[in-house]
């Protein structure tokens, strides 16, 4: 087989710039080089139309109707195949055959032309059947089903809320590609392995001149029915096969982790509901391990009946229709875009009135569902004032969605991560409401309807009071008169039913428009209460709004309080019921809450159970949830029930709204933040009512910590409870160095400064030298040597910062040490600073981030230090040494050889006694260094632990707490009109200083890269090189979010490449697989329990993933009729096909496989230079001098034909395993090697032009050399694309960690001093 590059994708036919652009633009890992087959298709006699007839038979003729201009008769389409089967052949003469052939050709032309025109205009079915009956003698097809029945069965759409059995659902339609050859072999389970690509043109070669010259249309395969794709990725439930492949390729690697976090929970709930309806107990037990009994099943049936009623109503109103076919380029509105659209409509309606106040009539008109708001903003004659749009948005938010965040009951729940928006139409997609699974409370908790027995009567919170005061609805009485009504009167007494309708209201508002949600909620509520729908028709809007604002966590806690579960549990059954109730919502619990649940279960299951201990654990759970109910405001955005797992997604969701608001006002977001932080105020009013807290009396004895605004960037705030400890003041109050140094010391003692405090403090510059002096003067360096004194300073200031080394802090430290200690006579500040710098270099070179730490010998260290200190020692220096010091240094003189005497003898005018003292000092520091290295601040140590352990728990954004602190401190008041000029001058002065946070220096400290020592320096723990993924997964309990670990049941099929280059496929298997530590493991058991599979079940197969690549783009020779199929390419002659349950699961598997393969694959090694000739070695060098020799008879003998060529093959296809490296180092290595691989591939493409000059055309050596070139070119191209995909996956993971504080910005640097070379 001659492997060559096709003309369309040949890199040799392009220019140099086009070649580089083509190589750089290759995002997928498929090979554009395709082999060219020499075999030609063979046809039997009399079968020239066989290809055309086979195409017409395989196409869905039964589903299409065609129309001719001149119709002759009417025949039902159902008789198309039956009458064609009854047609008889007759023996005719040669003239009759030719005439019949011409008529059949004309009928074929008419049939094809009118079939093409059918897509643009729908033909009449009666006329189409008539024409098809005329052409019936051309086809000889047998079909068991009629066309109409097959059309209805295959194209029946599926409703959204259908909970029927999957066996009754329509099967997906698979259409074969056009370029498949009839001679292809079909393997089992829907996979076709093809050996070549052929088209219909070769079969119609005889009729090429007679056919019309219209453009050959490529038949579009019929669309398939997609059921499990999420709405964010696939907006329509019907999508073509080609569009599906393109979208899968587009979303296979981009923002995988963010999309997984957004849609994983919704897919899990959908699968759970479908499994319950099917009666699968295995999946049901997996999601709900507690058997809830017949009451729970009854409630599930009740939910299904309600859902069927909702679907029936939506079907009548046309809301559940299957949307039309959507192309790839169409845009779909996401939640944030819908939110922006609502804000634009309401803002445009209010701005047309050109008034600053909002009238209730206009707001009511804007909210009415019948009003059609314009999609674009109405132009206004006059520009609105600055801040007008933001003010209108606040007014809309106060009216349509009351933001009662101050007086919320202290009951939290991590499952509700709701964003309070200015419109109640939009509820965040992150809010998880389960309609069928958690709709009712556990049946063991019985509700007492008698309110007298309730020791904790329910009181309406501020949100409900606010709604009751603002929402006034009308009730239709018998005389058709409107009277005031309150939705409170329709509040259900049973708390379980109240909780159910609360979740139902939130689900309807998130899923449907406002008018449909109101009507559906009223319909379900009326059927449940058995009251006429007309009675609550006027309360539709108020009912759904009232129930949607109720807190699910508040109702649940009230259920528990009625039974006195938390205060004094009396029976073990009560504890079991509460633990089951909490575990019903275990998916939304944090890791701390899960640990409390596990402790509670262990205590309940033990024989000697202590009810008081269990009650204490439940109390901890309640306190933890209470601390998380507090709302959080980030700038203009308010978050209720902030969840650490979804905080970053919420900020991304509201980012578009914030940018749009700033754009409407003509103010950028960065400029707004700058003005928000830089408005100066000399006097702060801290005695207002808004700032006063319930325990404000305590601050009289314990005042708050005054903090300047310049320190807000380095504060380390863990939660909102620490906000009451601070009082933000103006920077002018800390002009005194003593005040600022005392503030820093106070914050350091309370561990409230972040790890980048050293960079911030060192960047102040020499202007704040007095601050450095006052800060270091707090330390006591008396009777301590230089090493011990600097080690004491390192507990607060990190020695690994580059700014710290080059700042005047070390000079101040040297002067303070000299003042507190006796001078030896020759020591000065420069010598002490140089000794400190040498010690820092010793630490960096010894404890750098390398596989094996290199310890510098003592002799090398002393010699290097003395050479650095020699220029700083004056020849006139006098050594002053006491008797105690001489006795202290005497042991170094007797036991060890001295270098100082030898070195100082070579240096003129330098006393030897000074060299002896320096040598003894350096040896003592070296011994101390081996025992106790420099200390690391606590904040840097915590950041280092997160880096080494790969801590993937998102941390709360510090800027949100700082913004709230700034807002609560009332620093943004303007001075009186008489002091405006002085205030502006003061503000301009602070803008230029380095103290103030502005747009230029705002993020300089957060992105600062500082170096860290090895973890063994701190606590003796190993680094990433010997890091155990499984141990870390068990310790952190976040294996679902780790990219290097993936486990679960998956269907797969093994494909093997045979000798004739055809893929031989096996059959589909379903096994339990684990991807971890660079390996893919298949277990023989198909059990769902991971512990049973990994501990008990034997291993079916295990292999390393080095040099492997997973991709959703199947090779051209492999076709599959299954959805969500991807393949794993293994070096050699085999690959694996995998089928995932959804697109999100497929992306998770692909990302995990490629991540493990990239981490374990060794970087590309340099090619071995051998004497073996393949066609491009020494022959090309000889051909440059003389390409051929001419004989006497004129024949030419080329140099290449005289050489003996060898078949080329790669040395090691599987590749070598790389040593364990940190993720950052792996990314840097791939960034360096990928461009070199592309350059090598580009240079190798230019060799055929030189090879043609040294070989005779068509000679044996020429064919062998070109075959070697094709083989190596394919290998280089595949390898470069593989490493390019590795680089993309690792960079995506690395940038995701950095942006979410998973992987901190602490990277190693190269040190200027390297002791290895000495």
From Swiss-Prot:
Residues 364-384 have a biased composition (Low complexity). The keyword Nucleus applies. One of its GO terms (biological process) is ascospore-type prospore-specific spindle pole body remodeling. Residues 1049-1158 form the PH domain. Pfam families: PH (PF00169), Sec7 (PF01369). The keyword Nucleus applies. Keywords: Meiosis, Nucleus, Sporulation. Residues 177-198, 208-227, 360-387 are annotated as: Disordered. One of its GO terms (molecular function) is phosphatidylinositol-3-phosphate binding. GO terms for cellular component: cytoplasm; meiotic spindle pole body; mitotic spindle; nuclear envelope; nuclear periphery. Its main location: nucleus. It is found in: Nucleus. Appears to have a role in sporulation. This is Meiotically up-regulated gene 79 protein. It comes from Schizosaccharomyces pombe (strain 972 / ATCC 24843).
């Amino acid at each position: 087989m001659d492997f060559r590059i096709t003309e369309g994708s040949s890199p040799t036919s392009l220019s140099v710039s086009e070649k580089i652009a083509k190589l750089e633009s290759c995002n997928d890992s498929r090979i554009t080089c395709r082999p060219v087959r020499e075999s030609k298709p063979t046809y039997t006699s009399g079968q020239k139309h066989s290809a055309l007839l086979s195409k017409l038979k395989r196409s869905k003729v039964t589903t299409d109707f065609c129309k001719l201009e001149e119709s002759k008769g009417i025949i039902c389409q159902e008789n198309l195949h039956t009458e064609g089967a009854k047609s008889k052949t007759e023996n005719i003469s040669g003239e009759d055959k030719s005439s019949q052939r011409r008529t059949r050709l004309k009928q074929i032309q008419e049939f094809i032309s009118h079939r093409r025109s059918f897509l643009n205009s729908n033909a009449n079915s009666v006329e189409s059947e008539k024409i098809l009956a005329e052409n019936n003698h051309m086809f000889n097809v047998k079909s068991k089903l009629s066309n109409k029945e097959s059309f209805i069965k295959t194209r029946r759409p599926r409703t959204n809320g259908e909970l029927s059995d999957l066996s009754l659902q329509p099967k997906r339609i698979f259409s074969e590609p056009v370029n498949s050859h009839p001679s292809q072999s079909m393997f089992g389970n829907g996979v076709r392995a093809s050996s070549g690509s052929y088209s219909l043109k070769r079969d119609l070669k005889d009729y090429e001149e007679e056919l019309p010259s219209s453009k050959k249309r490529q038949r579009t395969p019929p669309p398939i029915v997609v059921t499990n794709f999420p709405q964010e990725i696939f907006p329509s439930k019907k999508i073509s096969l080609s569009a599906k492949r393109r979208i899968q390729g587009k979303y296979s690697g981009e923002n995988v982790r963010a999309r997984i976090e957004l849609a994983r929970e919704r897919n899990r709930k959908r699968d759970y509901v479908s499994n319950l309806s099917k009666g699968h107990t295995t999946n049901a037990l997996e999601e709900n391990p507690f058997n809830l009994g017949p009451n729970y099943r009854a409630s599930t049936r009740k939910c299904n009946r309600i859902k069927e009623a909702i679907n029936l109503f939506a079907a009548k109103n046309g809301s559940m229709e299957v949307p039309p076919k959507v192309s790839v380029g169409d845009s779909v509105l996401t939640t944030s875009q819908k939110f922006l659209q609502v804000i634009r409509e309401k803002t445009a309606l209010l701005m047309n009135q050109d008034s600053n106040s909002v009238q209730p009539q206009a707001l009511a008109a804007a909210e009415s569902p019948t009003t059609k708001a314009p999609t674009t903003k109405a132009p206004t004659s006059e520009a609105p004032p600055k801040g007008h749009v933001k003010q209108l948005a606040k007014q809309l938010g106060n009216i349509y969605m009351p933001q009662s965040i101050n007086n919320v009951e202290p009951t939290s729940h991590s499952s509700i991560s709701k964003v309070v928006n200015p419109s109640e139409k939009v509820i965040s997609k992150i809010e998880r409401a389960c309609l069928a699974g958690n709709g009712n409370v556990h049946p063991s908790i019985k509700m007492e309807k008698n309110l007298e027995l309730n020791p904790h009567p329910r009181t309406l919170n501020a949100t409900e009071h606010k709604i009751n005061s603002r929402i006034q609805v009308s009730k239709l009485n018998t005389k058709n008169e409107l009277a005031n009504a309150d939705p409170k009167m329709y509040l259900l007494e049973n708390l379980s039913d109240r909780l159910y309708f609360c979740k139902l209201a939130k689900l309807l508002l998130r899923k449907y428009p406002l008018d449909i949600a109101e009507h559906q909620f009223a319909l379900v509520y009326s059927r449940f209460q058995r009251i006429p729908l007309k009675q609550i028709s006027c309360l539709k809007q108020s009912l759904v709004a009232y129930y949607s604002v109720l807190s699910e966590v508040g109702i649940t806690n009230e259920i528990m309080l009625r039974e006195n579960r938390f205060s004094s549990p009396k029976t073990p059954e009560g504890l079991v019921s509460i633990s089951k109730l909490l575990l019903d919502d275990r998916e939304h619990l944090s890791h701390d809450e899960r640990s409390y649940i596990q402790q509670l279960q262990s205590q309940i299951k033990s024989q000697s159970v202590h009810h008081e201990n269990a009650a204490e654990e439940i109390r901890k759970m309640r306190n933890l949830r209470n601390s998380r109910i507090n709302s959080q405001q980030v700038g203009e955005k308010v978050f209720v029930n902030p969840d650490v797992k979804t905080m970053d997604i919420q900020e991304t969701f509201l980012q578009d709204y914030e940018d749009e608001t700033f754009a409407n006002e003509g103010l950028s977001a960065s400029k707004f933040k700058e003005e928000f932080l830089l408005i100066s105020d000399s006097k702060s009013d801290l005695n207002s009512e808004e700032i006063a807290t319930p325990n404000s009396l305590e601050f009289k004895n314990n005042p708050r910590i005054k903090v300047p605004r310049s320190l807000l960037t380095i504060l380390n705030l863990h939660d909102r409870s620490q906000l009451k400890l601070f009082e933000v003041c103006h920077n002018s109050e800390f002009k005194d160095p003593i005040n600022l140094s005392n503030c820093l010391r106070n914050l350091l003692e309370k561990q409230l400064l972040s790890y980048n405090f050293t960079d911030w403090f060192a960047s102040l510059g020499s202007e704040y030298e007095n601050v450095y002096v006052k800060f270091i003067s707090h330390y006591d360096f008396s009777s301590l040597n230089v090493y011990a004194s600097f080690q004491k300073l390192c507990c607060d200031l990190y020695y690994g910062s580059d700014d710290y080394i080059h700042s005047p802090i070390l000079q101040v430290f040297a002067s303070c040490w000299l003042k507190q200690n006796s001078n030896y006579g020759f020591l000065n500040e420069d010598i002490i600073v140089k000794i400190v710098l040498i010690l820092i270099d010793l630490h960096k070179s010894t404890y750098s981030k390398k596989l094996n730490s290199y310890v510098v010998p003592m002799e090398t260290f002393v010699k290097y230090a003395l050479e650095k200190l020699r220029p700083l020692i004056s020849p006139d220096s006098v050594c002053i040494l006491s008797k105690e010091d001489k006795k202290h240094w005497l042991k170094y003189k007797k036991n060890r050889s001295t270098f100082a005497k030898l070195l100082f003898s070579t240096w003129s005018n330098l006393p030897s006694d000074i060299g002896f003292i320096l040598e003894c000092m350096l040896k003592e520091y070296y011994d101390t260094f081996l025992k106790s290295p420099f200390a690391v601040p606590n904040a840097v140590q915590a950041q280092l632990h997160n880096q080494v352990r790969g801590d993937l728990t998102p941390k709360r954004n510090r800027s949100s707490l700082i913004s709230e602190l700034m807002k609560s401190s009332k620093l943004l008041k303007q001075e009186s009109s008489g002091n405006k000029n002085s205030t502006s001058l003061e503000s301009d002065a602070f803008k230029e200083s380095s103290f103030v946070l502005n747009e230029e220096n705002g993020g300089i400290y957060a992105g600062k890269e500082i170096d860290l020592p090895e973890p063994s320096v701190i606590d003796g723990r190993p680094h990433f090189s010997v890091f155990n993924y499984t141990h870390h997964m068990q310790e952190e309990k976040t294996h679902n979010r780790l990219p290097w670990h993936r486990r679960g049941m998956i269907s797969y099929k093994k494909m093997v490449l045979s000798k004739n280059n055809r893929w031989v496929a096996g059959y589909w298997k379903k096994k339990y697989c684990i991807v971890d530590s660079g390996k893919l493991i298949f277990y023989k058991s198909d059990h769902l329990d991971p512990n049973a599979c990994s501990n008990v079940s034997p291993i079916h197969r295990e292999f390393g993933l080095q040099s492997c690549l997973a991709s959703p783009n199947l090779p051209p020779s492999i076709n599959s009729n299954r959805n969500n199929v991807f393949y794993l390419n293994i070096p050699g002659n085999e690959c694996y096909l995998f089928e995932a349950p959804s697109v999100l699961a497929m992306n998770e598997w692909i990302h995990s496989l490629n991540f493990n393969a990239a981490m374990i694959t060794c970087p590309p090694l340099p090619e071995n230079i051998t004497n073996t000739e393949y066609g491009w070695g020494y022959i090309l060098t000889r051909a440059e001098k003389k390409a051929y020799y001419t004989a006497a008879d004129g024949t030419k003998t080329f140099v290449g034909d005289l050489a003996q060529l060898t078949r080329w093959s790669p040395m090691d296809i599987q590749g070598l395993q790389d040593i364990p490296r940190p993720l950052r180092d792996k990314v840097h290595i791939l960034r360096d090697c990928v461009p070199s691989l592309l350059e090598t591939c580009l240079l190798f493409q230019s060799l055929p032009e030189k090879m043609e000059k040294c070989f005779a055309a068509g000679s044996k050596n020429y064919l062998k050399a070109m075959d070697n070139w094709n083989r190596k070119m394919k290998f280089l191209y595949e390898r470069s694309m593989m490493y390019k995909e590795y680089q993309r996956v690792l960079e995506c993971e690395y940038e995701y960690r950095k942006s979410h504080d998973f992987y901190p910005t602490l990277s190693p640097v190269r040190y200027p001093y390297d002791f290895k070379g000495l």
